[in-house]
UniProtKB/Swiss-Prot annotation:
It comes from Pyrococcus furiosus (strain ATCC 43587 / DSM 3638 / JCM 8422 / Vc1). Mg(2+) binds at D10, D98. CDD domains: PIN_PH0500-like. Belongs to the PINc/VapC protein family. PANTHER family: RIBONUCLEASE VAPC1, RIBONUCLEASE VAPC3. Toxic component of a type II toxin-antitoxin (TA) system. An RNase. The lineage of its organism: Archaea, Methanobacteriati, Methanobacteriota, Thermococci, Thermococcales. Its cofactor is Mg(2+). Keywords: Hydrolase, Magnesium, Metal-binding, Nuclease, Toxin-antitoxin system. Residues 8-122 form the PINc domain. Pfam families: PIN. GO terms for molecular function: magnesium ion binding; RNA nuclease activity. This is VapC ribonuclease PF0355.
Amino acid sequence: MPLPPDITFDSLALIKMHSQSMKKILEITLAKFTVNLSIVTVYRYLTVRAYLKKNIELELDVLKDIYNIVPLNEEIAIKAAQIEADLMRKGMMPDIEDVLTAATAIYTKSLLITDDSKRYEPMRRFGLDTMPLDKFVKEVELMVEKELI
């Protein structure tokens, strides 16, 4: 499956992509794709980094240099409210971070890369497209392999 040019990471995917073991994959990803981050994802990532006693001002500068950080705007807020209200009517209580991340991916027309696709399953009918992080990594590795042939 050819990957689209625009992707969005959720917070768990972003944290894992910034691990030492994913350094090469991250470099390739940043070279090949426009990577969007919801401002909520940025907040969650910075929270983890602050917990680890990192300089989060510096961390934010790095994120701003390499990612397209998507601020919460009216369109995203409306889409998120529609999604959450619909899911609540169906008896679900979605996590606000997931709803805002999904709404951001829909707004940017990008593929949401996540470490837990099941969390986003009920939101797919709103136009959300997701891919598990491990599958994305394999697709990127295949893409590189094909370029080397």
